[in-house]
Structure formats: structure tokens, C-alpha cells
Amino acid sequence: MTKKLSLELRQTRKPIQTACGFCHEKHLQCDVGRPCQNCRKRNIASFCRDKVKRRRKRKRSDASNFDKDEAATQTLNFNTVNPGEGSSSAMTQDEKNTGTTTATTTRTTTNFRSESKASSSTENISRAMKDPADTIIANSLLDKPTIGDTDDTGWGFGSIWTNDEYMTLNDLTSFASESMPNQLGPIEEQRSPRRTLGEPLARRYDSSQPFQYLNFGSKLHKTDSRPYISLEQPGNVPSIPAFTMNKGSNDEDASPQQKESQQMQLWQQQASQLQQQASQLQQQASQLQQQRTQQNEPVSEWTPFQLRLLIKTPKDLFDKKNLVKPHNYRKAYKDLLECLHKMFLGSYYRRQNGRWRPVSDDEDQMRRRLMRKEQLQHIAKSIGELYMPKFVALTSNMIEEDLLLQELVLQRSLLELENMSKLVNCTPICIWRRSGEICFVSNEFCSLTGFYKREILDQRRFIVEFMDHQSVVSYYDLFHEHLAFGPKDSTRTILNKDQAVYTECNLLLNNGSYLKCACCLTARRDAFNISLLLMGQFLPIFDVQ
């Protein structure tokens, strides 16, 4: 710490013109000697140098100074030429020529500076418009207006530099909006007038334009925090106009104006088709809502496809929560048993005179029929012994409001999982209830299996319908042991703690064959530790031969 000086020493010391670099940085009193005493005491005498001062930047008030010089010159000339004041001698011819030359030079210099400034600004703006992406370089090239360079136009902002930057961005984005029309909304040509130097700023720039550079093309629709985006199914992709399919030498010979007009027509047709499809879906949703409301049918009886037409966001769910009723799991399990019976024994039995009879008495058929019957009994036994007792114990004290809350939580979780599936859109995903009813399939799952999304979601379908017999047996063993109510042994594996199980299964394809896949099963539970939703992520396994 620097030692404080006495009052006498401070009074005798006088400031010097230039201090050394060390004393200047440490705010010490330096002396005129080099090296100074402070540097000698610290053994840094070899580094003692005068502090190099920065040159002061001149204020750019040349225009006002030129105006003052011009006014002073004109006043001097007027006072010299006027013969009615005093007895001073007349100006000589050389002095007149000199005064005239000075005034002319001043005016010429002022005009030249203003013209060069306007031309450089125009060149920079045009250069930036040619390359809309390089906006930062374009903004840095613009000349900053001087302090005294003002006109009689009204500025939209308090800062002239900010104003100039916003106007440049507006010009760039207006140019970009003409070259990149928006395909999400109606195609409209937005031709914004170019900024001219002679046009008053108040007229060409209003209070709503500073943020106009954020809009490219037509205005985008405001999306929710979880927008429901449904990709087109196979076979429902809008058709491409015929003239785009017949591209030949005519396109090469066409002028840029013709190509632009053809592209605009293509965009307009695609936009109109998308609008028609959106309006049709909206009409279907409104008609469906009216019919269901008149019939007082709860949301739980709707198919997942119909439900998603009505409820697309969490806000829609809570706005229409009066339509949500507890799910009828009794009917769901009844349909599941019928589905399993048809899947395992449907091809081996037929109904005759109200009774089920074997289709064939062949030994091979009998052996297969017996194996399928044992597999079905194993599934029923695991449901009765591992699942039903715990489920009854956990739900015995639940009231109707608890079931309603459970369904609301399920629908809200389903929206969240659907949103998550759009972030990992490279993995085929299927989501179903604990009863096996499918609630959601991703587009990748449809591409993997070959089924249409509406074919799966527009009716009650179970996940077991898309597996082979052995995969169904393995699924129920894993579900009852690890996923239904959590693992029996909490210290088993980390995967079980994360409520996820990895296994293999065979997925049914649209052509009737099966594809071997690696499967990750994840359970989403409620406050009663009951699984609400199960999500399966499937990746195909290709055997290397």
C-alpha cells in the first residue's frame, strides 16, 4: 500500500507533464528523472518509460465549422466592400479575388463532403441488399451521422445511430421477404418501398416499423408452447402440379420473370391445398364435437384420432375438461381378452352351434394349438396373480374424483410425451395405456411397420396386435414384474430405478411378416404408483449374414 505523504511534502511537490507507465498505472507521484525514484526503489528502472498518451479524437463538427467560416468570410467581404462606413480605404483587387476564392472553396468543400457521404451511404446499403445474410458487415460499413449534421425531418428514435441501423435492417429484410416468400401462410407479394435519401424520415418510418425486420414474408401464426403438428400420412401428400413434372428445355429458355411466376403459382397451389386440408380437419373436429356433445358421450369413449382433433394443446384440455370422464378400463380389459383369444386361438378354433370347435385334428395343428393355449393361460395367470391383487389394493380407496384426476393427468402426460417424440423424431415410438390400448404412434413407427396412422388411432387397437405370440408373453412378464408397479427389488439395476426395461420383440409389418427390433419400455406413473402410460421405442435389428 502506498505511504501517505505529509502535508508539507504534498504542497512542495508539483505535478509533472508526463509520468512513466508504472506510476501512471499505480497512480503514484512521478518525477522528471528517468528512471524515476519509484521505479528505482522497485528495481524496475530498466522499464521506466514515459506514458504514451492517446491522441484525442476530433469531434466531427466540420460542417458547422465550415458554415461558421463561410458566414465569417461573407461578413468580412460585406464589411470590406460597403463604402458607407468610415473613411477606410477600399479593398484592392487582389484582396477581392482572395475573398471570393475562399468563399467558393468553402461552399465547394461542403457540397463535396455531403455528396460523398450520401453516395457512400447509398453504395453501402445497395451492397448490403445484394447480400442479405451479411447484415453485420453492412451495418459496420454505414457512415455514422455527425453531431452537427441534422435536418428538419423528425427522427423516430432518440438515437440517430439506432435509427440508421433499424432502417438498414428494414431494407435488408424487406428485400429478403421478396426473395423468400413464406409457404406456411397465404402467399402474398409484399413489396415495401425502398428507402430514399431525399424522402422525409417521418413519412417512411413509423412507430410500428422498428421490429418489422423480424417478419419474413407473411405473418406466421402464433404457436403454443406445445403445438400439435401432424405430418402427412402416406397417400395423403398434396400432389405436385403437372407443369412442375414436365421440366425440359423450356425451363432453360424461360426468362427469370417467367420462372418466378411459375414458382409463385406452385407456392400458391400448395398453400391453397394445405388450407383446404386444414379447413376440412377443422370442420371434422367441430362436427365431431357437436355430435359428441349432443350425445353426451365422454372423451374416454372417443378414439385417439378423434380426441386429438379436439384437444391439441394443454389449454384445450383444461378448457374442455368438463368432457373428460374416467376411462372405462373394464370394457378395455374385456376387449383385450377377446383380442388375445382371437390372436392365439382364432386360427385353430371356429364357432359352430354356439360352441368353439377345433378347425383340424391334425397332429401338428393340435401341438401348435396346445402351445398357444398354454401361452394364453400363462398370460391370464400372470394377470390374475401378479397384477390384479396389487391393483385392487391400490385402487380400493379411490373415489370417482380420483379417477377423473387420473384421466386428466394421463391426457396431460400424453401431450407432453407427444411433444417429446417430436424432439427425438428419428426413433419409432408408440404410446399405450396400461390396458394395452394404443394412444399415439409416431410417423417413424408408421414408416417402420407400414401401417397408416389413422388406421391405428381411429379405432381401439392394442399393442399386442403388433407383436408375435412369444413377444406378447415376454411383454406381460416384464410388465407385471417391473413396469406395472415398479420393480420388486429396488436394488436390482439402474434401469429399473429409471422405470425402463430393455428387451427384444418382433413387430408385425403391414405385409404380414415380422421384424426383429430392440425395444425400450418406459412407464409413466401417477401419485398412487399405478402406471398410466407406457412408451415403447423400437429400433430394427438386421441380422448380418
Curated annotation (Swiss-Prot):
Keyword entries, A-Z: DNA-binding, Metal-binding, Nucleus, Transcription, Transcription regulation, Zinc
Claim: Nucleus is one of the keywords in the record: yes
Pfam annotation, one family: PAS_13
Region (Disordered): 51-131, 228-270
Statement: the UniProt record of this protein carries the keyword Oxidoreductase: no
Basic and acidic residues composition bias: residue spans: 61-71
Chain intervals with Polar residues compositional bias: 72-92, 111-125
Positions with biased composition (Basic residues): 51-60
Gene Ontology CC: nucleus
Similarity field: Belongs to the ERT1/acuK family.
Name of protein: Glucose starvation modulator protein 1
Provenance organism: Zygosaccharomyces rouxii (strain ATCC 2623 / CBS 732 / NBRC 1130 / NCYC 568 / NRRL Y-229)
